[in-house]
From Swiss-Prot:
Keyword entries, A-Z: Cell cycle, Cell division, Septation
Protein role: Cell division inhibitor that blocks the formation of polar Z ring septums. Rapidly oscillates between the poles of the cell to destabilize FtsZ filaments that have formed before they mature into polar Z rings. Prevents FtsZ polymerization.
Pfam families in UniProt: MinC_C, MinC_N
Record text on subunit structure and interactions: Interacts with MinD and FtsZ.
Biological process, per Gene Ontology: cell morphogenesis; division septum assembly; regulation of cell division; regulation of cell septum assembly
Domain of life: Bacteria
Keyword Secreted: no
The organism's taxonomic lineage, starting at the top: Bacteria, Pseudomonadati, Pseudomonadota, Gammaproteobacteria, Vibrionales
Organism of provenance: Aliivibrio fischeri (strain ATCC 700601 / ES114)
Gene: minC
Protein name according to UniProt: Probable septum site-determining protein MinC
Keyword Cell cycle: yes
Alphabetical list of HAMAP family matching this protein: MinC
Family (UniProt): Belongs to the MinC family.
Classification via InterPro entries: CAP/MinC_C (IPR016098), MinC (IPR013033), MinC_C_sf (IPR036145), MinC_N (IPR007874), Septum_form_inhib_MinC_C (IPR005526)
Amino acid sequence: MTKTADLKGSNFTLSVLHLPNDDVALALSMLEQKVAQAPSFFASAPVVVNIENVSNEINFVELKSGVERTGMIPVGITGCKDKQKQAQATAAGFAVMTSFTPQQVTQKANMQPTKVVKTPIRSGQQIYAKDADLVILNHVSPGAEVIADGSIHIHGTLRGRAIAGASGQAEAKVFCKNLQAELISIAGNYWLSDQIDKEYWHQNVMITMVEDRIQIDTLTL
């Protein structure tokens, strides 16, 4: 029997660039700085632009080309009810996306056994625990990336990037013995190294999501 193409709805985690005003150049400058801090994380990553707080006209062509120059892929705009702006955004190549409150993923459906890695994770390496928790019994070097659909436990120093809840599980956590991360992320919410308070640097910590915000707590164990 011949199979045919099928079109289904799905949920994806997307980065959102929030514009505080119509100064596109300033927003793009900020985006370039963020991408420069973790280029492999943001490379070819889709991004949505939220223009809810912009009351003036926007140069959507400049906005789209500027985002593309950073290496990210602009897929659409959100926060816009103005039909004229929607038409301008569409003409520039943006999709117009409806804002919504995503349902939190609470079920750990089809979770697999925990993936355990005993060796150091070296620069340029990527480890992914699909539908599972991830345990690293060693260090994660700068430029390395560890990803899990569940939680991540690092029994060493985290100098690279840790991405937990990659499939959208907001209850996922990151544990590490020594926090020096380039980037930490849970369910699509991320902090770069400059957003991590220095009081948590070099500390044994637990990283969670609380009320849609990343929270870091030191552990005494």
